Amino acid sequence: MKITITSLLVPAAILLLAACDVKDPIHDPEPPVKVTVVTEELPALTVKRDSFATSSPRMLLLGRTDDITGVTLATPYFTLSPPSGGEVRADHVYDSITFFARHGGTVWGDTTYMQQIHLYRLRELPPSAPVFNNATVPHEAEPLGSFTFWPGAGRVPPVLRFRLNNADALGREMLAAGSSVMGDAAKFREYLKGLVVMADPSNTCISTLDPSAGGMGITLHWHDGGGTARSCSFVTGAAEDAPYMFMSTVNDPAGTLYSVLQQQTDALPFADAARQGYPDGQAVVYGTGGYMVRMELPDALPGQTEGRTPAKVEIRWHVRQPGWYTTPPVEGEEEEEVKEEMTNTPYPLPAAVRLYETDGDNRVKAAVTDAEGKPVDAILTDASPTYAKDGIYTADITHYYLSRLSRAAGQGMVALLAGVPVDELTASAGLMVMDSLPEIRVHWHEPVEE
């Protein structure tokens, strides 16, 4: 479908009177021209990546949630480094071990239920980077300890801290090993292997944990021969530990429309994803689950005629936050806005969605760039960045698209993937749902007839 909007800019005399104003080179050019905006809907399909890198993250995701795309489970694996200058001796008397994790401040999902996490010791050292989301590392059968907390706003403590009731044997081993092991980063890493925090199967939320600058670790408590209480902490954040930190993020779409996406070459067309609240269809971007939207651009500029010059090319799409939809009006009544009771804490709309080139197998290739070589992001507008029911994403692809057409005119559609930036997949659980097909918008300039 094509929609053409034509407007005449103000005459040159008025422009001269307003010469001190900042001009819009697209809609207020010099000299005056006729501006025509042509739009065309684009095919959109949801695809799911087979795997993506989740190693050396800035933020760790933890938990389990069940939403539009099915069950998503995020599990962080990490190693620890010992303190410098700490003295641990075999003749010291063990007291206890505690685990702590700085909360990242964000929770997504149903926060009306208690959440429980379990800490396990790894049997093997985690693999070094790059590590992908489908990787796992064997762990001991019994947890070192567990912790239960309320996930609601204002209820999550800034630091999750709990005693490891099943770690007494480990604590005594650490004292017995002495400073030669406990004070040497490489030896300690080889000794402990690492830890994994796992969400209980009953959990309904995904939370963020902050591993930076000693944000997570275990604290060993003991007292010396004179009865003086002492402690030292083994923490995350050291540069040598970063390559061994990663997340396993697994999405199981069983029972949802997206269960047809069994491999990355599969695609779910927009119209085939119609459901309640989305009568025309939907397409999904969900970084934690690996979901991206494939869009196919025409191999010629919509609205191209002799005498027109393309001034700007954009891709735009409308989204609605999961759970919000509008019911059709009944005769004599107004349409009703409905909020499904899907989640107590709505998933945020990503502040930006990046565009990538792709191929017939839906592989993520180079990022689309502008004239300065910077990645092109679709920016969320007309919506609150913290809580919004809907909004519009807009991406300026002028440089990329015109350059691409000049090199490969007539060679078929240009396919792009829209998704959470690949370097931010481990830091956000943002979920974006298109409720209408995306469109390409071309702003044309043509001379004003005298």
Task: Describe the function of each predicted region.
Residues 5-13:
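Sec-dependent signal peptide hydrophobic core
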Residues 2-5, 20-450:
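Secreted, disulfide-rich extracellular signaling modules
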